[in-house]
């Protein structure tokens, strides 16, 4: 196991390149199961979630080759067999295998997923969708069993706007008989990305990116080439890092429209943000204004940037309120920021941040992926050395983070942990 060390106080300057979208990648790979010939995906991020999904594909008879940039998935010889709990448990998005395997084989057995622990977020909307399409769903010994004689199109209204459920129902419906209509669908860019791949494979999908998606089932889908969209959350994280260090950073390979909510908030704080076609320039400033932020479904402020943004707000003049309407329990980073001298308190679904304070380097632990990003940003701002454990969470969603930040002037590196340190972290 590794730990990450950061010596804070450097101004970030230069160009940083964004990788492919994690939240697309974890759905595009399972989507390839639905094809009858190989699918090539360009620009996949080199993150642990992608590697775990690749090995799951291999366990059910597919082949997966990935050179760190491009993946080729050959689903031809796949069989419907139970997916083991071990790897599935490591990966929240392993639930997309349910929709894809149901769509192709009319049956699937998938262990209940793991990933980030963000409080209550059950997969009941996914199950509701599968049942509407004609599947029976049972929960047996910690695994979900899906079975269907045949899948038939249906009209499905989602009770809550859910990216996961929207994509999973799309995957199950593209080869069903007849028309499926998903109402109150999520509108995230990653949904459009998955729909684009499926359409390139031969699916008939209209309305992805709006709240009503119509899918006309087809008999077969074929392999194709697809280029993944850039990761808007990674882009946003680096935009926040630039503002936090009073830096001057060009974020390259980004779709500016995908980060408009963050751009607006940074400008409100006094940060200069200039957008180009696929680049964004962020220039920090010494004095930042406090702002209030409320996370919402896309195109609102993303819950995935709430934690990194909270770290930035410790530097702003005045009191800021950050409210997470999506995941109420997503404040595990606050205790760690407090260790670094932040003045933050949690009240219900909100974090109240009073600034400006000078953060101090400390030993902190990342409890989940975006908490890890928040602690990296805090470390870049802090005086002295910050040591972060729980780095495996960061590796789930940020490709080559240490190298990318080092290239633009951060003093950041990884070290192997001693057995003694690993024990301490486990018992903490």
From Swiss-Prot:
<keyword id="KW-0961">Cell wall biogenesis/degradation</keyword>
<comment type="function">
    <text>Cell wall formation. Adds enolpyruvyl to UDP-N-acetylglucosamine.</text>
</comment>
<dbReference type="Pfam" id="PF00275">
    <property type="entry name" value="EPSP_synthase"/>
</dbReference>
<dbReference type="GO" id="GO:0009252">
    <property type="term" value="P:peptidoglycan biosynthetic process"/>
</dbReference>
<feature type="modified residue" description="2-(S-cysteinyl)pyruvic acid O-phosphothioketal">
    <location>
        <position position="116"/>
    </location>
</feature>
<keyword id="KW-0808">Transferase</keyword>
<feature type="active site" description="Proton donor">
    <location>
        <position position="116"/>
    </location>
</feature>
<keyword id="KW-0132">Cell division</keyword>
<dbReference type="GO" id="GO:0019277">
    <property type="term" value="P:UDP-N-acetylgalactosamine biosynthetic process"/>
</dbReference>
<dbReference type="InterPro" id="IPR005750">
    <property type="entry name" value="UDP_GlcNAc_COvinyl_MurA"/>
</dbReference>
<dbReference type="GO" id="GO:0008360">
    <property type="term" value="P:regulation of cell shape"/>
</dbReference>
<keyword id="KW-0670">Pyruvate</keyword>
<keyword id="KW-0131">Cell cycle</keyword>
<comment type="similarity">
    <text>Belongs to the EPSP synthase family. MurA subfamily.</text>
</comment>
<dbReference type="InterPro" id="IPR013792">
    <property type="entry name" value="RNA3'P_cycl/enolpyr_Trfase_a/b"/>
</dbReference>
<protein>
    <recommendedName>
        <fullName>UDP-N-acetylglucosamine 1-carboxyvinyltransferase 2</fullName>
        <ecNumber>2.5.1.7</ecNumber>
    </recommendedName>
</protein>
<comment type="pathway">
    <text>Cell wall biogenesis; peptidoglycan biosynthesis.</text>
</comment>
<feature type="binding site">
    <location>
        <position position="304"/>
    </location>
    <ligand>
        <name>UDP-N-acetyl-alpha-D-glucosamine</name>
    </ligand>
</feature>
<feature type="binding site">
    <location>
        <begin position="121"/>
        <end position="125"/>
    </location>
    <ligand>
        <name>UDP-N-acetyl-alpha-D-glucosamine</name>
    </ligand>
</feature>
<dbReference type="InterPro" id="IPR050068">
    <property type="entry name" value="MurA_subfamily"/>
</dbReference>
<dbReference type="GO" id="GO:0005737">
    <property type="term" value="C:cytoplasm"/>
</dbReference>
<feature type="binding site">
    <location>
        <position position="92"/>
    </location>
    <ligand>
        <name>UDP-N-acetyl-alpha-D-glucosamine</name>
    </ligand>
</feature>
<dbReference type="InterPro" id="IPR001986">
    <property type="entry name" value="Enolpyruvate_Tfrase_dom"/>
</dbReference>
<keyword id="KW-0133">Cell shape</keyword>
<feature type="binding site">
    <location>
        <position position="326"/>
    </location>
    <ligand>
        <name>UDP-N-acetyl-alpha-D-glucosamine</name>
    </ligand>
</feature>
<dbReference type="GO" id="GO:0051301">
    <property type="term" value="P:cell division"/>
</dbReference>
<dbReference type="InterPro" id="IPR036968">
    <property type="entry name" value="Enolpyruvate_Tfrase_sf"/>
</dbReference>
<keyword id="KW-0573">Peptidoglycan synthesis</keyword>
<keyword id="KW-0963">Cytoplasm</keyword>
<dbReference type="GO" id="GO:0071555">
    <property type="term" value="P:cell wall organization"/>
</dbReference>
<feature type="binding site">
    <location>
        <begin position="22"/>
        <end position="23"/>
    </location>
    <ligand>
        <name>phosphoenolpyruvate</name>
    </ligand>
</feature>
<dbReference type="GO" id="GO:0008760">
    <property type="term" value="F:UDP-N-acetylglucosamine 1-carboxyvinyltransferase activity"/>
</dbReference>
